[in-house]
A protein has these predicted regions:
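Generic cytosolic/nucleocytoplasmic N-terminal low-complexity/intrinsically disordered segments
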Residues: 1, 66, 569-570, 917-919, ...
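Bacterial N-terminal signal peptides that target proteins for export
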Residues: 2-11
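Non-membrane alpha-helical secondary structure
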Residues: 12, 43, 47, 619, ...
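Glycoside hydrolase catalytic-domain context in secreted enzymes
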Residues: 23-691, 700
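Beta-rich carbohydrate-recognition modules and glycan-binding surfaces
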Residues: 678-1018
Length: 1018
């Protein structure tokens, strides 16, 4: 092995320099050596002959039904003890925001009672075999789903602490609290190395640099698991999960569940580095990631494989080459995302039917919902009996699951409530560890004039929306999935920053206003607590139309700071809560001191410990934190990672001031970006979709319901299964899974035989946006729709420019034509609304659906797309015209056969070169399509021609799908210098990622020159 390239050694060099300057590291973060291949695992929990013999004996006597049951993981709200017995269920989980009895205030005893009942069902003597259930939970910053638990800083803050041994202690506390509630398994740690801070899960990663992730991975596994059943305190240990395997932090533009485009060498040396120490420490489970991997070395046209179906990485690499002998669990319905286009599956998967995921190496399948997990069990059994899933693959999966259960001591442990004498959580001792973690995670970006630390007797104004908010202080994955909908009381413990300050600063005053109502020139300083509000996966992504600029993402914060300064407050100390580095130059310039506090958890005392002096006026606790993520100096300076070419951040990786080593920050550039980081200027026309609701509200927009009892509207509660209604119940909205099966990512509206509307509106109702470029670009309003109950009254669609400025069309017929129970993409041309009066320069309501009577409609992924044809005409007459193909139909024979159904042939290419296409070339009196490929670089898929269906038509080919196909004739006149064969595929242009055959590379090959060759595409 040789040292890693300079871009990775730079981080270690920066750390070494800081250490010399006086920052004493708890344990050094060592540089990594470059790897050339996937290393073998030397697990701290090796195979045990006695356990293997027990597994062999049990496995040999199990039925297929029992085995598939062991491979099934279901949600606690979607299963009963009787079903555990009947279906031999091997595992349950509680999703974010799911509690015993769906009671957020559930006590430890409530959790234990449920754990006991589920465990007892699995161990019932009437079962053919008594195989203990294993319960998993997302304990990602402490036991964060449980009221009263200790919640630690999220991983982004822990990365700044640079304290590997502290990580082990944090994991030990987490394990004790998880075990105290009767749960056996923590879905942690997250080992993502985050490369684009727009990702909504950035805060779940310790660093952009794999060195920190590698230093932490093994320590956390040691703290959670210990030696499991062989540990000195086995009942205080839980099974750990290394997740999400692999590349989740590297997706293009930071898109959650997107595509990571890197070489295998980069995957190995960047994204995998945390896994090696974690697996060596004995991690017993690995969770597959939602993302896809596209091998950059294979070229731009290479297939992007979903990790849930990536046999090479899950089986060939992780299990075979590395020797991992625990089990791989899928993520929430991740198996259902496999298609022919993103895997080797011969068919598109569903949540309840996906042999490809199991064949690829998934051992336990997370299928949360009752109807789907029951169907999954039946379908999987059928697939084994048909030979689609080999029996040996099932046996391997179950062997791994049983092995882990034996290693964890689950076969010999008593019922969950009897395993520990003390079931306390959130103890003073545990919170002290979290308080220490907060102290060490804070990064001091600015301290001009040594404003900090503050004297305890100074007159201090504590202001900002987050000053007295445990919800904002904790962020996502806190009680609820997204961390939203929580009050301070819901946490059942913990201290806000204001709560901490008032303990030690007798002259401090809390101002909860947004305008600094209590501020005046008698205040020595203001502590202004600002930043992001809670979010988690998907909903936290910064989309293409947004930037990293804090002043635009959270304009209320800079407004408050300006108000405080205008009212004469002498010094401004800004404390930023955020799950990512942000471009905050405007806020930095207006602050005398600026602290990046990340998402510190429940123990706000840890912040006050560092901000204030002792009673004697001395430094109490110095700043320790150093940036584990580079800090941007421009609104769109992303991706930004240490070692990048032209690396020039505002504050570099490893930066962090202290009281011992201070410094002055000069005035910073405040340039804003006019367009989003993923948008290119279109000269008055948009060229990038704008999202208003995608698995949750986009920044600056709220989905609401309204009715006569409250026309001003009610914001829909999201990220849980709780419903939101208008006061008199005219319309009710409930989060449901979207078309991809992603939890609570769409909204189902139910009109209860009354007038009501579902709509998206600016968070500030009167605030408008100039979205004229989308109209100029021939755009459409697009959303996913699923009708559960067809409307009994007219349905209207509207786009408003602040009521009564509206444009409304009747879409009743189109909605009635949608298939009941199935998701359909609806697209309405924006011009329809412009024709009815919408002023697109002042939009505040980009979607409104109005009806009365009985009607149930689910809506998801609401956006405007430029250059998008509609499938609902402006008169709302119908949805896409569907043409049933039940007999042969000509597409192009001596020209386009039916111009009403088929459009003219087109071409596509990338890279150098071009394509010349003549769709009406005269070949001896007959029209043919003549194509010349000019100078295209070598490599598959660099240029293509296509024959499109004319928008807005759709074809129903189900009648001929089994036996039919597409036939065409091809004559090659000259191959030129190309050595590549022809490839062919079928693609649904509107859904290219989910509806395509994939590249068929051998069907055409290289036909002989000068003769017509017939090709049949099944």
């Amino acid at each position: 092995m040789k040292p890693l390239p300079w871009r990775w050694r730079l981080g270690a060099a920066a750390l070494a320099t800081l250490a010399v300057a006086g920052c004493i590291l708890e344990e050094p973060i060592l540089p990594l050596e470059e790897l050339q291949d996937w290393p073998p695992i030397n697990s701290a929990i090796p195979k045990d002959k006695a356990i293997e013999a027990k597994v062999d004996a049990l496995l040999a006597s199990m039925s297929l039904e029992e085995k598939v049951g062991q491979m099934t993981q279901v949600e606690i709200a979607e299963v009963t003890p009787d079903e555990i017995r009947q279906y031999h269920i091997g595992s349950v989980l509680n999703g974010g925001g799911s509690f015993p009895g769906q009671n957020k205030a559930a006590t430890v005893n409530d959790w234990l009672a449920l754990a006991d009942s589920l465990w007892a069902a699995s161990m019932d003597p009437s079962n053919p075999h008594q195989i203990p259930l294993i319960w998993g939970t997302d304990a990602v910053h402490g036991h964060n789903n449980v009221r009263g638990a200790t919640m630690f800083p999220h991983n982004i803050g822990l990365g700044a602490a640079r304290a590997p041994n502290l990580m082990k202690r944090i994991a030990e506390v987490t394990a004790r609290e998880v075990a105290a509630t009767g749960i056996d398994w923590a879905f942690a740690p997250t080992l993502a190395v985050v490369r684009d801070d727009r990702w909504g899960r950035t805060y779940e990663g310790f660093s952009e640099n794999p060195e920190i992730t590698a230093a932490y991975g093994g320590k956390i596994i040691e703290g959670l698991q210990g030696a499991l059943a062989k540990d000195a305190r086995p009942n205080e240990r839980v099974v750990a999960t290394a997740k999400h395997f692999i590349g989740d932090g590297g997706t293009d533009q930071g898109k959650d569940q997107g595509v990571t485009i890197v070489t295998e060498h980069e995957l190995l040396n960047i994204h995998a580095r945390g896994y090696f120490p974690a697996l060596n420490a004995g991690a017993q489970t690995v969770m597959a990631s939602f993302n896809s991997w596209q091998d950059k070395a294979a070229g731009e046209g290479a297939k992007a494989y979903k990790m849930h179906g990536n046999k090479y990485l899950l089986t060939d690499v992780l299990k075979t080459k590395m020797g991992f002998d625990g089990f791989i669990v899928s993520d929430w319905n991740g198996n259902g995302q496999l298609t022919t286009g993103n895997s080797n599956s011969p068919r598109n998967c569903s949540n309840s039917d996906c042999p490809e995921a199991i064949n690829a190496g998934i051992d336990m399948v997370m299928v949360p919902y009752r109807d789907e997990w029951k169907a999954f069990i039946a379908n999987t059994i059928a697939s084994v009996r048909s030979g689609e899933i080999p029996q040996a693959r099932i046996d391997d999966a179950v062997r791994r699951i049983l092995r882990v259960k034996y290693r964890a001591g689950l076969f010999t442990k008593p019922k969950p409530s009897a395993r520990l004498v003390n079931h306390e959580i959130g103890t003073e001792e545990n919170r002290a560890v979290a308080r220490e973690a907060v102290q060490k995670s804070l990064v001091l970006l600015k301290n001009n004039g040594n404003v900090l630390p503050l004297p305890r007797k100074a007159k201090i104004l504590v202001a900002g929306k987050s000053a007295d908010s445990l919800s904002n202080q904790n962020g996502g994955w806190s009680l609820s999935w997204q961390g939203t909908g929580n009050t301070n009381a819901d946490f059942g413990g913990g201290t806000t920053l204001w709560g901490a300050v008032q303990k030690i600063a007798p002259n401090a005053v809390l101002d909860t206003s947004t305008t600094g109502a209590l501020a005046n020139n008698t205040f020595d300083a203001a502590i202004v607590v600002i930043g992001e509000t809670p979010y988690a996966e998907g909903l936290g992504d910064i989309g293409k139309t947004k930037t990293l600029e804090l002043a635009k993402l959270r304009p209320e914060d800079i407004t408050l700071i300006d108000a405080l300064k205008a009212k004469g407050v002498k010094k401004i100390v800004t404390v930023l809560y955020s799950g990512r580095p942000l471009y905050a130059n405007k806020e930095l310039n207006r602050s005398d001191a600026f602290v990046a506090a990340w998402l510190p958890g429940t123990e706000g005392d840890g912040i006050a410990d560092v901000l204030f002096r002792t009673k004697a006026g001395k430094v109490n606790v110095d700043f320790n934190g150093k940036l584990s993520y580079s800090w941007p100096g421009a609104a769109c300076q992303t991706p930004l990672n240490v070692g990048d070419a032209g690396y020039a951040p505002q504050f570099a990786y490893g930066y962090g001031l202290s009281y011992a080593q201070g410094g002055t920050v000069a005035a910073l550039d405040e340039t804003s970006a006019d367009i989003g980081c993923g948008v290119t200027s279109g000269g008055g026309t948009a060229d990038t979709p704008i999202s208003f609701f995608d698995r949750g509200n986009a920044d600056g927009w709220n989905m609401k319901v309204a009715a006569p009892s409250k026309w001003s509207g009610v914001v829909i509660a999201q990220a849980s299964s709780a419903s939101t209604s208008t006061p008199n119940g005219e319309i009710t909205a409930t989060p449901v899974d979207d078309k991809s099966g992603i939890q609570w990512s769409a909204i189902k509206a139910k009109w209860n035989n009354a007038e009501g509307q579902l709509y998206i509106q600016s968070a500030v109702e009167a605030e408008t946006q100039n979205l004229q470029p989308y109209l100029n670009a021939g755009g459409a309003l697009v959303f996913d729709a699923r009708v559960s109950v067809a409307p009994t009254a007219p349905v209207k669609a509207r786009i408003d420019c602040v009521y009564p400025c509206i444009g409304e069309i009747d879409v009743t017929t189109a909605i009635q034509a949608l298939p009941v129970g199935n998701w359909t993409e609806v697209a309405i041309p924006l011009q329809c609304f412009a024709d009815k009066g919408t002023d697109f320069t002042a939009i505040n309501t980009p979607l409104l659906i109005y009806s009365s009577g009985q009607f149930e409609l689910s809506v998801g992924n609401v956006r405007w797309e430029p250059n998008r044809a509609g499938n609902v005409p402006c008169d709302g007459a119908s949805a896409d015209p569907v043409t049933v193909l039940d007999a042969p139909r000509d597409v192009y024979v001596n020209g386009i056969a039916d111009p009403a159904l088929f459009d003219v042939p087109g071409s596509w290419s990338y890279g150098s070169g071009s394509i010349a296409l003549n769709a009406n070339f005269d070949d001896a009196g007959e029209k043919v399509v003549d194509v010349t490929y000019n100078g295209l670089k070598e490599g598959g898929g660099n240029g293509s021609i296509f024959f499109p269906v004319k928008s807005p038509n759709l074809f129903d080919v189900s009648a001929v799908a089994a036996t039919g196909g597409v036939q065409f004739e091809l004559r090659v006149l000259d191959y030129g210098g190309s050595t590549q064969p022809f490839w062919v595929k079928l693609v649904c242009a509107r859904k290219p990622d989910t509806c395509r055959t994939g590249d068929l590379t051998t069907l055409v090959g290289r036909p002989a020159l000068g003769v017509w060759t017939t090709v049949q595409l099944p």
